[in-house]
Amino acid sequence: MPDFSMSNLAVAFSITLAAGLFTVLGSGLVMFSKTPNPRVLSFGLAFAGGAMVYVSLTEIFSKSSEAFAEIYDKDHAFAAATMAFLAGMGGIALIDRLVPNPHETLDAQDPSFQESKRRHIARVGMMAAFAITAHNFPEGLATFFATLENPAVGMPLALAIAIHNIPEGISIAAPVYFATRSRKKTVWACLLSGLAEPLGAALGYLVLQPFLSPAVFGSVFGVIAGVMVFLALDELLPAAKRYSDGHETVYGLTTGMAVIAVSLVLFHF
């Protein structure tokens, strides 16, 4: 397996950090902006979902199979990659079951939300931050390892996760800001949650680095592919559909796939 230089590690970590910091952008939309156009939001979420699905199934899963092929024959390598992919989906589904993502439960326009006591709203914000932070750890690990092995794969994935992090920031910022009216506390809540991604990357690398091998890389990339596909299908696409009854979701989905497909072709040249 490749021996990564400090510059490789720095680039991968920086891209992971940048993707995580997009959570803070969500706080800015809550504090300073008007309500975003639902159709634009729908398109953007679907775009991110399409990008994540495409890059996961065409590039990241292939990297898993290629890594396993260094120790198994082609058929067994594909089977091992498939098992890792399914394990990734199962693992993130379990996390989602134990710590549900609060996207669907937070709506600043809901009357019951507006009328709740500030202490209760603050507690909702803390729960949202905790839940999203738990989901951010595997996302950070995915971005870091994908970029570390091949920036042509990692950068499109980081872009998709960055877009995905904006509504997550809104989910945290809305209850915190309405409860405290403090921009500082709101930004800090989003920042701490976003930093879970580079933290997940750093911890994951420190734990796995002594054991890096074709089997480990194959397992990591297979799990990453499964996690990303699950997140796209479970969070991004349903959220995109909720914001629009038109064709914005399918347009965003196909555009995201097309843009990532073209970018990957260009990277290969």
From Swiss-Prot:
Swiss-Prot/TrEMBL GO biological process terms? zinc ion transmembrane transport
Q: Which HAMAP family match?
A: ZupT
Q: Which GO terms describe its cellular component?
A: membrane; plasma membrane
Q: Which UniProt keywords apply?
A: Cell inner membrane, Cell membrane, Ion transport, Iron, Membrane, Metal-binding, Transmembrane, Transmembrane helix, Transport, Zinc, Zinc transport
Give the GO molecular function terms: metal ion binding; zinc ion transmembrane transporter activity
Its recorded reaction(s) are:
Zn(2+)(in) = Zn(2+)(out)
Q: Which PANTHER family match?
A: ZINC TRANSPORTER ZUPT (PTHR11040:SF205), ZINC/IRON TRANSPORTER (PTHR11040)
- Record's protein name: Zinc transporter ZupT
What does the record give as the organism's lineage?
Bacteria, Pseudomonadati, Pseudomonadota, Betaproteobacteria, Neisseriales
The membrane topology of this protein is: Multi-pass membrane protein
* KW Nuclease (keyword) present: no
Q: Which gene encodes it?
A: zupT
Top-level taxon: Bacteria
| Pfam families referenced in this protein's UniProt entry, alphabetically | Zip
Q: Show the stretches that span the lipid bilayer.
A: 12-32, 41-61, 75-95, 126-146, 152-172, 187-207, 211-231, 249-269
| Amino acids binding Zn(2+) | E139, H164, E168
Per the similarity annotation, which family is this?
Answer: Belongs to the ZIP transporter (TC 2.A.5) family. ZupT subfamily.
